[in-house]
Amino acid sequence: LSIIWVITVRMVAELAGNRIWDTLLVAGSPLLIVHAFTNWDIPSIFFAVAAMLAARNRRFWLAGVLIGLGTAFKLWPIFLLGAYLTVALRKRELAPFGRMLAAAVVSWLAVNVPVYLRNPDAWGEFNRLNTDRGWEWTTIYAVISRITGWTGFDSGEGAPVILNAVTLVLFLLGCLAVLVLGLKAPQTPRIAELVVLIVGFFLIFNKVWSPQYSLWFVIPAVLALPHWRLLLTWMTVDMMVWPVLMWHMMGADNMGVPGWFLNVVIIARDAFIIAIMVLVVQQILGRRRDKVRDAHNGHDPLLSLPSEWKEPLPIDAPSAPTEPAFDTEPAKV
């Protein structure tokens, strides 16, 4: 996993382009100290970053394959397709996205079908567990429950059907909001900006926030909004959620911290995530300076080749790629 992360950081340096020093926020992330070796999230991040690099280099089939492989480890790399779909719809260039989607489906099936055929019960255990389990300790639902005594949407035993539906609907509404924003914005949003919003909505609304999930947010946030103090503060607060939760679970008899203290840390973490998302929205709407665009003559370094960064990209005129590819011109009315 350590070697995989080193390679991931090297690819992030490629994607950071002319802001290569922002890569230090990824390499030295406080979240990495606590969660790097928890579960299989590092490989999924590796495949997601590799997919973004492949898409930047116009290798859309490869990008799709990598997204499918990443999704075989963890669900979140599939969220990248939402970002690329938004850009594809805005540009009316669906062919690159279609290749990515097809390759992602095929590669995911290539990994999962043999496992399913060998042991279908084991293959479906993840879905069963996530369907049947209730909310996790550090979600907004758990915080509301501890503060108000609320017992949840569902009553009795069995799968939390209403909770599952509510979390899914809230996430889908968030994705729809990202799509509308991406289509209506004055200039095509950058891929990292869209990914930040999609992943952010998933983290905030999902009924499970395993501590290592926060690692998913690190690289998109660094590439979308390289505000060092804000990101380092968020990562430091987020890093504290897990040890504070463990401390709380020790119980009052063993000097564990009270529930209100855990709630404060969780609310602070969520507030930072939401603040980052709000700033990204303001950036997309042109109400905040975009340091990444400024450093690349208006281009999105995740959608354009380094050779293209030398020439300014006019806000009111399309670029002229030599082949069909995602670019960053405004939407055509």
Question: Each predicted region: which residue ranges?
Answer:
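Multi-pass, polyprenyl lipid-linked donor-dependent membrane glycosyltransferases
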Residues: 3, 24-28, 32-50, 73, ...
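Perimembrane helix-loop-helix junctions
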Residues: 79-106, 117
